[in-house]
């Protein structure tokens, strides 16, 4: 170990009071080490030696002298100041970076109080970091849909929409009223025209629709017109609401209509046969009388009166 210059540790006020050369004289260290390898000192001697050294060192500081009274060269003082400034700047730079990251505050002034404030235990910094992080964390939102969102409605826009709906609703009502009036006029026209109109087949006056018949358009009622269009309109067919409907002669059922027609045909045939028989008898009588009359005129009977 190199020797330290003795003039560095001279006492500034009283150089004769204490000399550090005796304490820092390590010239005989090698010899003492060699001797110590051969003979080890006792524990009692060691303890007494340490006690004397401690008493000497305490007397060194109690005599009114200290480290502040020591003489230190200017170069060493400049190096110490540079080292202290470097440490302060390094601590200040790290803390400033943390503050900028966490809270965005301005750079703090590097004073003695701020240095003591910045040197804090780790848990407090973690707690501050957690609080600031929770306050600045942005909550993730849901992904926006592609559907266009309607603008936020206000009371003015709602009033405008209500006014527009009120303006459109009267137009719709007017249209409905006009359509109803037009339908009523059509019904009135049909009623007026149908008041003097009758079905030429069943003589009915009320029908939902007038249809085309053998005498032209709108000459048959709806029921008779449908049967006429299908070729089944016969004299025996009459709707039940017809004023000329007779149960014995008419029906609104096709099956019964066909039966009535068959019965009528049978009656007609019977009548025709009777007429034929009567005509034959009439012909026979007329022919016999004509024969007798013809014979009487052409042939004269003999006269037998002379025989009597």
From Swiss-Prot:
SUPFAM superfamilies noted in UniProt: Glucocorticoid receptor-like (DNA-binding domain)
Region described as Disordered: spans on this chain: 34-57
Span of the annotated motif Nuclear localization signal: 142-149
GO cellular component: nucleus
Subcellular location: Nucleus
Superkingdom of this protein's organism: Eukaryota
GO molecular function annotation: DNA-binding transcription factor activity; transcription cis-regulatory region binding; zinc ion binding
UniProt xrefs under Pfam families: GATA
Task performed by this protein: Transcriptional activator that specifically binds 5'-GATA-3' or 5'-GAT-3' motifs within gene promoters. May be involved in the regulation of some light-responsive genes.
UniProt-recorded name of the protein: GATA transcription factor 9
Organism: Arabidopsis thaliana (Mouse-ear cress)
């Amino acid at each position: 170990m190199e020797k330290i210059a003795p003039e560095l540790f001279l006492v500034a006020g009283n150089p004769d009071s204490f000399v550090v050369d005796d304490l820092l004289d390590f010239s005989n260290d090698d010899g003492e080490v060699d001797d110590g390898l051969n003979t080890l000192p006792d524990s009692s001697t060691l303890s007494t030696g340490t006690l004397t050294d401690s008493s000497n060192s305490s007397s060194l500081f109690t005599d009114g002298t200290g480290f502040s009274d020591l003489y230190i060269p200017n170069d060493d003082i400049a190096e110490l100041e540079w080292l202290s400034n470097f440490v302060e700047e390094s601590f200040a730079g790290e803390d400033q970076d943390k503050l900028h990251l966490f809270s965005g505050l301005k750079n703090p002034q590097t004073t003695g109080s701020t240095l003591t404030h910045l040197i804090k235990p780790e848990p407090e910094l973690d707690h501050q970091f957690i609080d600031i992080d929770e306050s600045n964390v942005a909550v993730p939102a849901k992904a926006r849909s592609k559907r266009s969102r309607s603008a936020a409605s206000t009371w003015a826009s709602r009033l405008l929409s209500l006014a527009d709906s009120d303006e459109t609703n009267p137009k719709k009502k007017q249209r409905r009223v006009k359509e109803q009036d037009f339908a009523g006029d059509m019904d009135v026209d049909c009623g007026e025209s149908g008041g003097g109109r009758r079905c030429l087949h069943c003589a009915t006056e009320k029908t939902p629709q007038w249809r085309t018949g053998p005498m032209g358009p709108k000459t048959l009622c709806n029921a008779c017109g449908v049967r006429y269009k299908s070729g089944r309109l016969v004299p025996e067919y009459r709707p039940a609401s017809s004023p000329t409907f007779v149960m014995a002669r008419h029906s609104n059922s096709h099956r019964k209509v066909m039966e009535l027609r068959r019965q009528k045909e049978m009656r007609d045939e019977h009548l025709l046969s009777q007429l034929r028989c009567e005509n034959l008898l009439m012909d026979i009588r007329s022919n016999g009388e004509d024969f007798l009359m013809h014979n009487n005129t052409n042939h004269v009977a003999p006269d037998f009166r002379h025989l009597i």
